[in-house]
Amino acid sequence: MENRWQVMVVWQVDXMKIRTWNSLVKHHMYVSKKAKGWYYRHHYETKHPKTSSEVHIPVGXAXLVIVTYWGLTTGEQPWHLGHXVSIEWRQGKYKTQVDPEMADKLIHCYYFNCFTASAIRQAVLGRPVLPRCXYPAGHXQVGTLQYLAXTAXVGVKKRRPPLPSVTKLTEDRWNERQKTQGHRGNPIMNGP
């Protein structure tokens, strides 16, 4: 029987980001109780030797599974040390990979308070606006004019500790897209 390979998207991350992610997830599961129904699986509970932890987040009839790995092939720099994260959407037997922005949007929709259409109307009428967006990482796009006006009226309140964000977990120097320099920064186009 031949070896069967399975290709996965794995985001290479720093070890400290994984520690921060795990501690934020545990805090919101056990202390603040905002992550109801989430399941944290330790490395000794998994069968795979390179899995350091798993977080199962129920999203409707499906589950979002964030798996952190250790001991993968070392990266280009010494601080990489082969730590990584994969994000899966599972529903029954179906599994697919999800990018961090989509994972944050799914978590935002199901678990954390956000502005509603009535909040904008209440702010315009001068009534107190109770719902605040408790998970701003779930908004990847630029807000509408009404949303920006409502945030200006209500104000933004920093949360301590912050809510766990998959985008923040995977964002790092080596995961960012290549940024091309403008015409002034390109020595080839400007000449010597």
From Swiss-Prot:
Residues 151-164 are annotated as: Multimerization. This is Virion infectivity factor. GO terms for molecular function: metal ion binding; RNA binding. It is found in: Host cytoplasm; Host cell membrane; Virion. The modification Phosphothreonine is found at residue 96. Vif-defective viruses show catastrophic failure in reverse transcription due to APOBEC-induced mutations that initiate a DNA base repair pathway and compromise the structural integrity of the ssDNA. In the absence of Vif, the virion is morphologically abnormal. The lineage of its organism: Viruses, Riboviria, Pararnavirae, Artverviricota, Revtraviricetes. The record marks 150-151 as: Cleavage in virion (by viral protease). It comes from Human immunodeficiency virus type 1 group N (isolate YBF106) (HIV-1). Its main location: host cell. It is a peripheral membrane protein. Induction: Expressed late during infection in a Rev-dependent manner. Residues 40-44 are annotated as: Interaction with host APOBEC3G.
